[in-house]
């Protein structure tokens, strides 16, 4: 979704019987352990603000996003984004914003040193084919991997706090 011209993902989670302080502690620990100190994180990943009074946790994250990884080939970009949690008693909102990508110039041939903003790569206008039915080859890859990563982060935050995460149920019907 585009908010004020920028790609931004938002979600609200409800956690029964958890205080604001307990949620703040759980989320801060999750962000530190999984996003700042995680195995794919790079040097700029850090928690930028923790404000217990206003219930805000903010983090600037830099990590590798791998499109393909084999013994002979690595296709990855540096993925930058900002996470902001607004915490209250029994609930929290999570926002992922300021998304952009950058290829490593030392491992990527060609002119890929530019900063690629999500607004130019993963919106419907950029990532879908002209008829709007399929993902485009290059920008569609950015879109699907970004949304998968967003879902993983949001689900991890929900599980860290004990929020109920709805699972998709698939029903298989056999017909003779």
Model-derived regions, located:
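Ser/Thr-rich, low-complexity intrinsically disordered terminal regions
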Residues: 1-176
């Amino acid at each position: 979704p585009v908010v004020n011209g920028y790609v931004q993902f938002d979600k609200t989670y409800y956690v029964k019987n958890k205080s604001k302080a307990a949620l703040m502690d759980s989320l801060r620990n999750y962000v530190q352990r999984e996003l700042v100190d995680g195995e794919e994180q790079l040097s700029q990943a850090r928690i930028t603000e923790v404000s217990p009074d206003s219930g805000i946790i903010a983090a600037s994250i830099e990590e590798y996003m791998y499109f393909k990884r084999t013994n002979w080939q690595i296709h990855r970009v540096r993925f930058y984004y900002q996470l902001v949690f607004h915490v209250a008693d029994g609930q929290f909102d999570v926002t992922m914003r300021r998304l952009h990508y950058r290829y490593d110039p030392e491992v990527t041939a060609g002119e890929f040193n530019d900063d690629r903003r999500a607004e130019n790569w993963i919106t419907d206008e950029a990532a879908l084919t002209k008829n709007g039915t399929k993902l485009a080859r290059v920008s569609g890859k950015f879109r699907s991997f970004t949304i998968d990563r967003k879902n993983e982060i949001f689900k991890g935050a929900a599980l860290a706090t004990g929020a109920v995460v709805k699972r998709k149920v698939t029903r298989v019907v056999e017909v003779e």
